[in-house]
Amino acid sequence: MPLSLDQRSLQAPWRIVDELIEQPSWGGRYIIDLKGLGSSEQWSGKKVGQSYELSRKAKLFNPADDSKVTLADLIASDPAAVLGAPVLTKFGADISLLIKLTQAKGNSFQVHLPEGKTLGHWEPKPEAWFYLAPGLFTFGIKLDKSFTDFSNALHKIDDCMRRLSDEVKGGQLSLDEAKQKTQELIASVDPYQYVNVVVAEADQIIDLTAGGIHHSWEEDNERFPDGNLVYEVQVDVPDERCSMRGFDKGKFLPDGSLRPTHVADYLATIEQDAEHNELSRHISKPQLLSEQNGAKVESLFRTPYFNLDRISIEAGAEYRDDASGGFHHLFIHAGNAQLGDTKLAQGQSYLIPAATGIYNIAATEKAAIFKTYLPV
């Protein structure tokens, strides 16, 4: 039976309940500290790699009356009031939007299927990143390098790792020996010579929504001890249905086994044209939309799947917006603000239902807010 909510609740700024993902190996303290949880016993001595700021399974909290509800139940209570009629018409009631705050070291060489293409069970996963601080990543392949040589290098590493994994599990080889042999092979074939290695700048936008583009986060503890600090927006698709790993960087699990790799599918999916691999086509900086009365709005992402703006408000200033055309998701990246009777706290996310209509945010201190919404 659908949840029954009054009009006041449908107009409330609903806070997204924190969902932090512990990652002892590649996470850090950035997300914990940003959310004001640094002194929490629950997170003492722990590292977090991601927080889900919005997902299909999100739970929401109404600060006005302490009520709680799942996102699915809130939408089901009145889809048009929550999402907005234009959003409902174009995207339907199942909002497959995933917003993550990430602190990550290196991950595997990956690719996602482009829209309109089919390959086995794989599905597209349009995504975009906004770098909050300098970092390191790879993006696209080098068009002046042999793709055949790249393919041979990845297959050679993958075949070797599978053989070494079997030997470790069979007791013929120690895990340390297998790791050493793998790193020696990786150094000799050097898969990085075939991809673009990019030093990320703060406020850099990486648009991967086209699909078919090789990408990875990279690790350099001397230059970037915090890893990659990224605000991600993507279509919500489980990794096992969208992320093809071409190279897992020589990583073994403690028992000598391997994470799944999909070298043939990865290579078959990579687009080899300039449109997909020229960095200038996909990497950009914020674009100013408006600036008045102490409030500045910049465009970050403009895609067919989602849009993202950054709103910067000076202390004591106000920002006015209108959600009637479709819901807004707000993440308070810095500072604190006020929306009606609700405090918008740093490190927290809020859902503004379409029924809210026009709303005003007053910055009690200098604030930076990310606003995600759907293009209608």
Q: Each predicted region: which residue ranges?
A:
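Short, basic/aromatic beta-hairpin or loop at an interaction surface
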Residues: 172-189, 323-331
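Ligand-binding loop in jelly-roll beta-barrel domains
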Residues: 102-106, 114-115, 123-124, 133-136, ...
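Conserved short histidine dyad/triad with adjacent acidic residue
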Residues: 107, 111-115, 133, 304-323, ...
